[in-house]
Amino acid sequence: MRNRFGSLFSLTTWGESHGPCLGVVIDGCPAGLQLSPEDFVPAMSRRCPGRPGTSPRKEADTVHILSGIYQGKTTGTPIALQIFNTDVNSDPYREQDDRYRPGHGQFAYEKKYGIVDPLGGGRSSGRETACRVAAGVIAAKFLAHYDIHCLAFLSKLGQVSIEEYPKYSKEFAQSIYNSPFLSPLNHDAIFQIITDLQNTQDSLGGVVSFITSPIHESLGEPVFSKVQAMLASALMSIPAAKGFEIGLGFASADRYGSEYIDPIIIEDGRISMRSNNCGGSLGGITIGMPLNGRVVFKPTSSIHKPCGTVTKTGEPTSYVTQKGSRHDPCVTIRAVGVVEAMVNLVLADLLLQQRCARL
């Protein structure tokens, strides 16, 4: 089982949804970066349950620093972080442990390994992403030294969406962080969609977009470690992610070359582009433009409606998520912080690689 991501700036996550704790080890972070437990609070609180449309499971997600820090600064050694699980209820899972959960990784894990932890989804649960968000905090602090900033936000829920990529600014970022849905979309419309989901006991997918400040470093390694390839690998590893695009993405198929190509211009003394259909990457390398992309998330499979399945002995039956279970009617809202973290982790890794690319 591969639990490590990254090359020079890497993370290894461990732990299960209903285990005593989860954790992550970050390797490759340069020494001298200021870091304290308080630095993790804003990002962890954005991923935590408690917002409308999220799971009622109550987890503080306090990050405990176990190693790699001395006198408030990174030492260059591995940084170990630990997050305790404090609100676990495994009974609803044990009651239907004789059958497979449709739409979940349980069947695939058991088929591959011959054994699986079914409680709360075990290792395949979205709970694992708390570790990624914690690691992403460190990556973001490192990138800030190079004036590279990333922001993710909910850009589509149901029929409510924003198609364009806004320009990154600290003011826009703060407006997203202050939003109960981490979104520039109409809050009343989102709240109504979530209310309808709760009333019908159903779930819904969505889209998370990400934007960055202009990246003047040449990040990305031809030909197999292009920036968009690394982002795709990172973002598609998030639970429930089903699609990724950069820039104009799949809409590029409907454009003529004369419409799609981004004209090169001089702006403020720098080579720039009049548009950014490419999403900030040419030849798999960043070119001084913002990186823009989107990730599509499926509806969560944990709904309070029966679905056909079979028992572990092969007998037809049904599975219904028990009333005592705690799940998100729209997991996309809490995926916002995970997308932001994974983009930061990719960029931090590529930035370290770029430091080795030329004299």
Curated annotation (Swiss-Prot):
Top enzyme category = lyase
Entry GO CC = cytosol
Q: Does the keyword Heme apply?
A: no
Q: Which domain of life is it from?
A: Bacteria
Which reaction is this enzyme known to catalyze? 5-O-(1-carboxyvinyl)-3-phosphoshikimate = chorismate + phosphate
Pfam families in the record, alphabetically?
Chorismate_synt
Q: Which residues bind NADP(+)?
A: 47
Its EC number is: 4.2.3.5
- Per UniProt, which keywords does this protein have? Amino-acid biosynthesis, Aromatic amino acid biosynthesis, FAD, Flavoprotein, FMN, Lyase, NADP
Q: Which cofactors are named for this entry?
A: FMNH2
Query: What InterPro entries has UniProt attached to this entry?
Result: Chorismate_synth (IPR000453), Chorismate_synth_AroC_sf (IPR035904), Chorismate_synthase_CS (IPR020541)
In which residues is FMN bound?
123-125, 283, 298-302, 326
Q: Relay the cofactor remark from the entry.
A: Reduced FMN (FMNH(2)).
The GO terms this record gives for MF are: chorismate synthase activity; FMN binding
> What pathway, per the record?
Metabolic intermediate biosynthesis; chorismate biosynthesis; chorismate from D-erythrose 4-phosphate and phosphoenolpyruvate: step 7/7
Q: Which GO terms describe its biological process?
A: amino acid biosynthetic process; aromatic amino acid family biosynthetic process; chorismate biosynthetic process
Q: Which family does it belong to?
A: Belongs to the chorismate synthase family.
Task: State the NCBIfam families in the record.
Answer: aroC (TIGR00033), PRK05382.1 (NF003793)
Under the subunit heading, UniProt states: Homotetramer.
For this protein, the record's PANTHER family field holds: CHORISMATE SYNTHASE
Function in brief: This reaction introduces a second double bond into the aromatic ring system.
| UniProt name for this protein | Chorismate synthase
Q: Which organism is it from?
A: Chlamydia abortus (strain DSM 27085 / S26/3) (Chlamydophila abortus)
Q: What is the lineage of its organism?
A: Bacteria, Pseudomonadati, Chlamydiota, Chlamydiia, Chlamydiales
